[in-house]
Amino acid sequence: MIYNFSLPPLLIQAFLFENSSYLNKWSKKLPKTKNGNSYLNFIASHDGIGIRPTEGIFNDKTLKNFLARLKKNGSKFSYRKINKNKKKVYEANITVFDALKITDYDKIGKFSLERYISAHAIMISLDGVPAIYFNSLFGTSNDEAKFVIT
């Protein structure tokens, strides 16, 4: 199995900014798998949304805008230390449902469910084995109350 770690942030970014250019460019470069191998396509897991897989794909401005939108939608972030004085976002701690909830074009989330279902449809349609995270079956939102007490 080849885990498609780049898929979650690229797919979410495409919906948030109504621009699939990064997702399209990345997907066209995916090599065909050899016999006995397959991609594992997922957009949610217990680990949050990995940001590191966007390195070399997103430019600085795109990454900055992406992280800002995720923060507005309720994300907390985990960081990795680059050196003594510098850290970078490692992952966004937000459910996919909440990540897709609000965009600059849909400020009240009128089409959040449509984005959520469409994101899963795209993930399922890609070459490979689709993996749907259990919590995604229910459109789970962030649990802020539990986050605060842990």
Can you say where each PLM-predicted feature lies in the sequence?
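Active-site and adjacent substrate-binding regions of carbohydrate-active enzymes
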Residues: 1-150
